[in-house]
Amino acid sequence: MFKLVQLLGDNAVRALRDIAASGTFVDGKISNPHSRVKNNLQLHDAAAYERSSKILLDAMIQNADFMEFSFPARIAPPLLTRYTPGMHYGLHPDAAYIPLPDGQLRTDVSCTIFLSDPADYDGGALHVQLGNADLRFKEAPGVAIVYPSHTLHEVEPVTRGERLVAITFIQSLIPDVQQRNLMHELNEIAALEGGKMEPANYTRLQAVQYQLLRMWRR
């Protein structure tokens, strides 16, 4: 299960593009030196990283769709990455844990935030294998795709222009993907239909929601 989220407005997208334009990028293997499939660039500028990650983190925690889909306990500071012609990121799952200054983060949910206009580059689609479905995403600036970190995915080769995105990983309060999906579905039903229910039945539904969260939260 995945979700597309309108995460950023035009002003935030412009601010992130400006940060990227003046920031220093290095070989993406600096953070994954043993990868045989990673071929991109990533921001390597402490001040720019701090500014860009704050913009993105603020947007995430203020976005109800993002929060209600991922149930975040911790969010890794988002990182700007760039692809120019010839670059790609071959098929891979995300690592189970990533190191952070305050300790390892378990990667339950992955997120890519698109910052380039799709018309400004060719290729570069995010290809995600979800079950038997092969899905490709090349979204408008400011849109985020959120999906389970264990899924196989790749960035197809860029053949023209520049693909600028931000990526991050989420440790979820509900690490089991099936339980997380069920909780999200139940919450959506409650939000959509709760106002039409008899008060007593809505109270019972809330009790089920709360008890499942108690059972599944880690």
From Swiss-Prot:
Q: Where does 2-oxoglutarate bind?
A: 163
InterPro entries to which the protein is assigned, alphabetical: Oxoglu/Fe-dep_dioxygenase_dom, PKHD_hydroxylase, Pro_4_hyd_alph, Pro_4_hyd_alph_FE2OG_OXY
| Residue span(s) of domain Fe2OG dioxygenase | 74-172
Pfam families per the UniProt record, alphabetical: 2OG-FeII_Oxy_3 (PF13640)
Q: Which UniProt keywords apply?
A: Dioxygenase, Iron, Metal-binding, Oxidoreductase, Vitamin C
State where Fe cation binds. Answer: 92, 94, 153
Q: Name one GO biological process term.
A: DNA damage response
Cofactor: how bound: Binds 1 Fe(2+) ion per subunit.
GO MF annotation, one: iron ion binding
Q: What cofactor does this one take?
A: Fe(2+); L-ascorbate
Could you list the residue ranges that cross the membrane? none
Query: What EC number(s) would the UniProt record show?
Result: 1.14.11.-
Q: Which HAMAP family match?
A: Hydroxyl_YbiX
Its recorded name reads: PKHD-type hydroxylase Sala_1910
Species assigned in the record? Sphingopyxis alaskensis (strain DSM 13593 / LMG 18877 / RB2256) (Sphingomonas alaskensis)
